[in-house]
Amino acid sequence: MGAAEEEAAAAWDKAEAKEERIMVSVRLRPLNGREAGDSCDWECISPTTVMFRSTVPERAMFPTAYTYDRVFGPDSSTRQVYEEGAKEVALSVVSGINSSIFAYGQTSSGKTYTMTGITEYSVLDIYDYIEKHPEREFILRFSAIEIYNEAVRDLLSHDTTPLRLLDDPEKGTTVEKLTEETLRDKDHLRNLLAVCEAQRQIGETALNETSSRSHQILRLTIESSTRQYLGRGNSSTLVACVNFVDLAGSERASQTASAGVRLKEGSHINRSLLTLGKVVRQLSKGRNGHIPYRDSKLTRILQSSLGGNARTAIICTMSPARSHIEQSRNTLLFATCAKEVVTNAQVNVVMSDKALVKHLQRELERLQSEIKFPAPASCTTHAEALREKDAQIKKLEKQLKELMEERDTVKSQLDCLLKSDCDDHSDGRVAKRWDEHSRSSESFARNASEEAFSVSDTSGVPYQDQDNAVFNGSYVFSDDRDDIVFPVQTVDLPEETKHEKFMSPWHPPSHHSSSDCIESYHMTEAASRTASEVSEEHCREVQCIDIHEHRRSTSHKFDLLLPQDTEFQTPELEISKEAVPQPDEDQELESITNRMEDPTRMCPVEEEQQDEIVDTCESNGTTDNDVKLYTCDSNISFDIQKPYPNGCLTVKRCILSSKDRALSRSKSCRASFMIIPNSWFDDSEYTSQTPPNEILKHTPRRFDKVRRSLYPENDNPSSVDRSEFSGEVSSDEVVKDMSTIDEVAKDMCPSDAEQETLTSDISCLTKLKKTDSDHEDELDEYQDQQSIRDGSTTLRTVKDVGIDSSLSASPSRWPIDFEKMRQEIIQLWHECNAPIVHRTYFFLLFKGDPADNIYMEVEHRRLSFIRRSFSASPAGGELNSAVVSSLKNLRRERDMLYKQMLKKLTNGEKERVYARWGIDLSSKQRRLQLSRLVWTQTDMEHIRESASLVAKLIELLEPAQALKEMFGLNFTLAPRSERRSFGLLGT
């Protein structure tokens, strides 16, 4: 027995309450004989929804559709009502859980008819369960009472003396001297039910011939225990009871034509039902306030069933007749409140005295240990919680300050490095020449594979070997599979500088099997001084080199690594197979050799396709040099890098590649165009002070100033269809633009050093072999996407190259776009029921600064998503839960503003505000009217007035930058350590 007692004590410890809501069902009875001429105004439109069919008045405050756990129509049987609305709750009693089943409704709505059937079906199922579990011993006890005119009577006794109610600390409210019969079998129970039916008070009214004049409560108590010890799970004794409550119906004296005794009975019935409604309504709101259980004997007896230790099911019966519409609405209102009530049902375990003693001993030991070794005190008061939150806020502020300091430090370091580069290169002169062209193509390709930019087949990341590529004087794009190289630029440096390595602060080293690679082209001061001794040479032009590629099987992209702090990338360059003819390989190699010997000589492809591709620029002596722009089937993009501080303009190399040798396209470069460079600008005015592209690549800070110098506010680059445009831009205009950039650059970084000639860029057109059909599809898909996104290729002059469309646009466009987006956001606030305080903060914080673009965009997208979620209404016509929640929160905010007006505004201020908002000073509830008016319209004057008023009521200080950063913390972009890209910084 000791083990059994321990098991019982353990079961006592583990008997935990389970929270659940009251199960509410609605049964709609058919029209009776008295209602034959009346219309039916209620209809069950779904298994869970009942709807009012007639027209609802315009100012009606009640809904037209009601949703519950289950709704039964006039054709539903009592058996169906029991199976779907009460069976699960009724059978909980055999598992040791208390349960109660109510029937609630107006008089003559079918409550007694429903409860009689449910009681019979429950008894049959309980006895069926007992027969299927012979391993447990069941003891059933039955009692019955009625509450007639607030007097408790025993239905199993012929004595009509009212019984007293007693409060027991363990059992709760009990009825003194109540008869409790131990049942022998189900026939015995049926006989007792018949006795109760005969003893109950009934009477005749105008609405019902057999109207119940009292509340009836039938209680069936079941005690079960194991016949022998079968293990831990079946050793305890369980005791639970089920209550079948048939409430008397609410009635109106005018409808029932009651008088005398019937009138007195009706008044007591209505009073007890009113108390029941108060209790249910208070429980539906929570257990914070006082719950008037003791105002009625009915609620006092059923206290445990209403929000206590029991599972509860309520069946609300109603008449569909129009004459009872008001009583039907009251019934549905009661059901709506009841489904929000939460109960805490738990298994009732009975323990022996020894088991109870052991349980109490363990509990005593636990309490003593807590006293001796108290646990660390948690935040139990509001003050402690506030202190903890303040500490967290200070910690976050400290982290934010450290991050801002770190950002400023890095920014200053970058500025110093850029300034150092300006000083280093002010006296340096680097001449450009081509490498030895006498070597064969095969030898050239083999050497270039070790010295050039290359693309790894496994990683797809280009890199540069500084030891070989830079200091041996070649910049070559190479493909490991084809051994085909593109000579791009050659730089000669003295021998003593060829083996020095320089590490860029922006680029981490990439590793290759042959040597360490870095991605910076910056020279140190020592290298610059040595380079200044190199003789100066003028730049020469090398025309198109067409190279035929073989064995091309997969597409390949050159992705240039850019600094982490800039979003500009080398644009994707493509040319279709139709743009360039395909000569034999021998002719191509011969063409390469000839062009390397004589840079001014045209390749055969240029001669044949002169109209489609490029017009050869005239010789160096030509005075009227032109820069010609053409369109072809490919899209070629350029970047104008940031001007060098000494005042130089560099045009990025123009490289045409096939669809399988495409450079990755920057998202910021939306315009694709092609420029054919002129003959070498022999004039020192044109060629002097041109730094390497790679240096300019890392100086993006002065883009905005350069853009403003290139484009006036009213200047908008034109877009011309690429299939129809063929025009020329004179070199004078280009030189004028270059001079403008030179002046801007000199203003930004003045230098007294002599302007030296550096490298100019070359252009080369690459003819590529036709690939397989898969690659053709890839090119077609890309071109289709380009056509859809751009509509037509935008052709710009050299000054437009590489500048993002958002930057190159006129600065005057931002205020217009800002006002348009702000108006859309205000409209979305109105549609999405956005919080008023949030609207006020946002409206006052973001007033049109260009840096606010990201916050405006994120807010617009967030509200658009909320609006889409609002539009997805659930089945049954019920309002979206998100919409209901947002409306509730909005109403709470308005109530808060209503209260704040009393605290924050003086009487004079109130009168001025009322006059400004058009509220009559003689009207009532002026503060309530004002709180309902703010943020209800979308015109800008109303918005400004609303934001100003709310800011004053909530004591919103003048917006500062720190506040804006905290407000937009969720939208801040921060770099990720593992990639050179941006990601969202979550909070």
UniProtKB/Swiss-Prot annotation:
What biological-process terms (Gene Ontology) are attached?
Answer: microtubule-based movement
This protein's source sits in the domain of life called Eukaryota
Location of the Kinesin motor domain: 21-341
Keywords for the protein's UniProt record, in alphabetical order: ATP-binding, Coiled coil, Microtubule, Motor protein, Nucleotide-binding
Q: Which SMART domains match?
A: KISc (SM00129)
Q: Name one Pfam family in it.
A: DUF3490
- Binding locations of ATP: G105, Q106, T107, S108, S109, G110, K111, T112
The reply to whether Transcription figures as a keyword in the UniProt entry is: no
- Which stretches are annotated as coiled coil? 350-420
- GO MF terms, alphabetically ordered: ATP binding; microtubule binding; microtubule motor activity
> Which residue ranges does the record annotate as region Disordered?
709-733
The record's PROSITE patterns line, in alphabetical order, gives: KINESIN_MOTOR_2 (PS50067)
Q: Which InterPro entries match?
A: Kinesin-like_fam (IPR027640), Kinesin_motor_dom (IPR001752), Kinesin_motor_dom_sf (IPR036961), NACK_C (IPR021881), P-loop_NTPase (IPR027417)
Instruction: Give me the Gene Ontology terms describing cellular component.
Output: microtubule
Instruction: State the family it belongs to.
Output: Belongs to the TRAFAC class myosin-kinesin ATPase superfamily. Kinesin family. KIN-7 subfamily.
The identity of this protein, by name, is: Kinesin-like protein KIN-7H
- What gene is this protein translated from? KIN7H
